[in-house]
UniProtKB/Swiss-Prot annotation:
Designated gene of the protein: mtnB
Gene source species: Geobacillus kaustophilus (strain HTA426)
Domain of life: Bacteria
Name of the protein this chain belongs to: Methylthioribulose-1-phosphate dehydratase
Known function: Catalyzes the dehydration of methylthioribulose-1-phosphate (MTRu-1-P) into 2,3-diketo-5-methylthiopentyl-1-phosphate (DK-MTP-1-P).
Single GO biological process annotation from the record: L-methionine salvage from methylthioadenosine
Amino acid sequence: MSIVVKKWKELAEVKAELAARDWFFATSGNLSIKVTDDPLTFLVTASGKDKRKQTDEDFLLVDAAGKPAEETNLKPSAETLLHAEIYGRTNAGCVLHVHTVDNNLISELYAQNGEAVFSGQEIIKAFGIWEENAAVRIPIIDNYADIPTLAREFANYIHGDAGAVLIQNHGITVWGRTAFEAKKHLEAWEFLFRWQVKRLLLQRAGLPVG
């Protein structure tokens, strides 16, 4: 089995799991997985596809600039430049970007703070943080319609081989050293977003919550 086929299957499995959660509204979102380091190549979702379906045209191979590495009629997802920035600056092996109601709400509620902070939740251990009462922070950046501008702003928040950034009203982008790590971190962030949204609703209803 070639490395491209192996990575294709790995990314397809992640896509299927996220699709089962209904995290690909209206063809939104994009996923990628690194194939080679030198030269840098990675598989990324093709633009405009229904990601709830499995087809032979789900992904295409692109180079370090996010351009197709092989002849194809497919176009890479619009945010491929963000993936390229991550791979070019870290040892990440997988990047996942999804739009959910909860992550958009959190990005809107805390945009003025420039970040959202969560603490006191056991799920934080998913990030490898085991301290009692630990807190995690996720930066929130402005959403620029011009993707190169967005990529330049996004690049300021790429620190380490695993991380996450919220784009205001434009979803979350998570990366990890492996597809498993990226998916685990994405699931943990989405848990925290949903918990906070429900917590705020309960507080507004006057119910006693911490």
